[in-house]
Amino acid sequence: MANYFNTLNLRQQLAQLGKCRFMGRDEFADGASYLQGKKVVIVGCGAQGLNQGLNMRDSGLDISYALRKEAIAEKRASWRKATENGFKVGTYEELIPQADLVVNLTPDKQHSDVVRTVQPLMKDGAALGYSHGFNIVEVGEQIRKDITVVMVAPKCPGTEVREEYKRGFGVPTLIAVHPENDPKGEGMAIAKAWAAATGGHRAGVLESSFVAEVKSDLMGEQTILCGMLQAGSLLCFDKLVEEGTDPAYAEKLIQFGWETITEALKQGGITLMMDRLSNPAKLRAYALSEQLKEIMAPLFQKHMDDIISGEFSSGMMADWANDDKKLLTWREETGKTAFETAPQYEGKIGEQEYFDKGVLMIAMVKAGVELAFETMVDSGIIEESAYYESLHELPLIANTIVRKRLYEMNVVISDTAEYGNYLFSYACVPLLKPFMAELQPGDLGKAIPEGAVDNAQLRDVNEAIRSHAIEQVGKKLRGYMTDMKRIAVAG
């Protein structure tokens, strides 16, 4: 099979990369009614599979789970989760032939096997759903022409999808119809009903394309969302310890610092995050972020280029075929780093202390968010898509580090995201070591003293922060998310 994106001509590639429309709430007036009375069969009962299924059932849809015979016979975790929540569970052969919509929510590396197994069982005119388009775009999976192929991609982990639904809200969502598979012209109606059933329409829905979702998703998770957090954690911890900071304190400052800092980002963008600093610290964080952007821009561009060309995907799929040798080696090496093995700090760090002593971390967040956004937009991805795949998801990923450091982040994210994270962080850490060696007192681990600042310089920096395109689009999109619960700030 050929990478689907690479079979398109340039005009088609640009059209699909640039497909992005914020949908009005009136477009979801019918809710999930298009799928009511139809049979929806979910394949896979992980975080997205279970939580989307719970939401869809609560929205009045007929939901069941198709699992492999071995998973049922051995009563594996997927079987237990589905049955304990009262869902009907059966084998592919038992459930797929009756399904009007088959939703594939298995891990990326399983998609080809799953799709090749279920396709012959699907009835004529049924629909196949994804929450990530890697199998269609990067693998180039060929789907029977009578089958409608749609995507509903919540921009949050599965647990968040469920929690926001229970509060009567939802999470921002991308929806798409594969242009090669919409034989009856009903793809958008199916996708809208599915998105409404998960609650996504209450937080904002972008009509996108499989191509735009995949390319922007890969870029975000490899760079700012995971790779930058991992590289930043390792670099900052080593720098603090090198300068005499207690390893336990250094570990907590970083582990909980990302979440505390990005909570401000979630509530008010880069502007609010920077406003949490004193004026001298803000000027220093801005200067550091500009240096970081200059150093890291070629690395961000290389990742985007490799994603667009398919180089990244072909390399990762080769590792799949080699039993994940690279992935597992990188995972093991990460687990042995000084940051991951440092002792726990039992004392309390106040909220403002994370900002005052984390100026470099704030600069890293600002630089990474802006670079990821700018690089995606320069590649033809629309600003709204770039925002969701950079700034919006960052607090959610930072929240995973609080639980069990980088180990937890890499467990929660997909194997695809984890592989890309390691590619980025393994390149970024050595790239930034000369920069780290030139840091000044107060950049990390110590607060910058209060002092006089130049009014004109402060005015210009504030204007530069607030006028960045990601701040403009972010203000609009956050207006749809004002009801989202506040992620608990670390204590």
Curated annotation (Swiss-Prot):
InterPro entries recorded: 6-PGluconate_DH-like_C_sf, 6PGD_dom2, KARI, KARI_C, KARI_N, NAD(P)-bd_dom_sf
Name of the coding gene: ilvC
A GO cellular component annotation in the UniProt record: cytosol
Enzyme Commission designation: 1.1.1.86
Protein name (Swiss-Prot/TrEMBL): Ketol-acid reductoisomerase (NADP(+))
Family, similarity comment: Belongs to the ketol-acid reductoisomerase family.
GO BP term (any one): L-valine biosynthetic process
Pathway given in the UniProt record: Amino-acid biosynthesis; L-isoleucine biosynthesis; L-isoleucine from 2-oxobutanoate: step 2/4; Amino-acid biosynthesis; L-valine biosynthesis; L-valine from pyruvate: step 2/4
Species: Shigella flexneri
Positions with a binding annotation for Mg(2+) 1: D217, E221
